A protein has these predicted regions:
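Acidic, polar ligand-binding/catalytic clefts
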Residues: 24-29, 93-154
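Extended ligand-binding regions for polar small-molecule ligands
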Residues: 24-25, 76-85, 138-177
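Extracytoplasmic small-molecule ligand-binding "clamshell" domains
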Residues: 30-115
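Short glycine-/acidic-enriched loop or helix-start segments at secondary-structure transitions
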Residues: 55-57, 122-124, 159
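C-terminal motif of bacterial Sec signal peptides marking the signal peptidase cleavage site
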Residues: 18-22
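Bacterial N-terminal signal peptides that target proteins for export
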Residues: 1-12
Length: 177
């Protein structure tokens, strides 16, 4: 009687493995497909001016649109490097943090940068990366910097965090190499 039970259990286990394999279950996932949309496409980035991190030269269009050569800074360089890794073009929009968060929520932006700290008030509305560096800001205090992305788009955020870790020399545990 035990042998048929073991055979049945093995058959169920094998069937379960086949079903899960057929589902192509990938973790982490992006419910809205942000990473897939950006790869080989366009990375839509919202930038709020913050000296050294995001600098903007010239006129900003009425919808916040700027040409690629109008934006510079350390975070702009990080974003451009990430886009290169994904084979994507970068499209920048300049606005306030609040407006950028609104645009991420509505799906018209993939990422927001601009000296945003880990104490950001936006974490209940959008996804926040792990801190990727620590800097002293104008208040004289150390702050951990993060980037903002669509809430729940974990594959996109994970890929961004891996890029930031590689560029900044961090390991998964957050320590330098």
């Amino acid at each position: 009687m035990r042998r048929p039970l073991r055979t049945a259990a093995a058959a169920v286990a094998a069937a379960l493995v086949m079903v899960l394999s057929a589902c192509s279950l990938h973790v982490p996932t992006d419910p809205d497909g942000t990473l897939d949309a950006v790869q080989g496409g366009t990375l839509r980035v919202g930038a709020t001016p913050h000296a050294g991190f995001v600098d903007v030269a010239g006129q900003v269009g009425p919808d916040g649109a700027v040409s690629d050569d109008q934006v510079s800074g350390s975070e702009v360089d990080l974003v451009r490097g990430f886009a290169r890794e994904l084979g994507a073009e970068v499209e920048f929009v300049v606005s306030s943090e609040g407006e950028l968060v609104r645009r991420i929520e509505e799906g018209s932006l993939d990422l927001a940068v601009g000296g945003i700290t880990s104490k950001s008030p936006w974490s209940s509305k959008v996804g926040v990366t792990r801190p990727y560096t620590e800097v002293v800001l104008s208040d004289g205090k150390k702050h951990k910097l993060v980037m903002l992305a669509p809430m729940g788009e974990n594959a996109f955020i994970s890929e961004l965090e891996r890029h930031l870790d590689r560029v900044t020399g961090k390991t998964q545990a957050g320590e330098g190499r």
